[in-house]
Amino acid sequence: IVSTFQKIIVLEDDLVPFPYFLSYMNAALDMYENETNVACISAYVYPVKSKLPETFFIQGADCWGWATWQRAWNCFEADGKKLLEHIESNALQKKFDFDFTYPYVQMLKDQINHKNERLKAFSACCFDFLWIIFAALK
C-alpha cells in the first residue's frame, strides 16, 4: 500500500476511531509530508489533566491509529541491535526512558535477547515496539 500511495493510515482491528480521525490523519499527512524529522502521525495520547493544543509533537509513536509516509517506512530500522547502538552511542538513554521513569532501553535489550516479558506486559509485538523506537529517534 505504501509503495502504491506513498502514505498509509493504520488502525488496529479492534479500534473504533473518532469520527474526524481520517480527516485529522489526512490533513497531518499533507502538512508534515516534507518534514523529514517527522516519522509518523499518531492519533492517541495518554490521558493528561492539562489542556493540550489540538496538535503537538511528542517523542515516539503509538500503534493505536497512526500514519506514515513511504520516505519514513523506507528508513525503518528493524534491527534492535542497531537501534540500541544508536541510543547508547549518542547517550540517549535518559531521554529515551523519559528521565528514567520507564525502562524502554531495558525493554529493547530484552527484545534483542529474546526476553520479551516486558513487551508482553506492554501488549506490544516486536514490530510495534521497534517502530516506536525508530520514530522516537527521528
State the predicted function of each range.
Residues I1-V10, L15-K138:
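An acidic/histidine-cluster motif and surrounding catalytic segment
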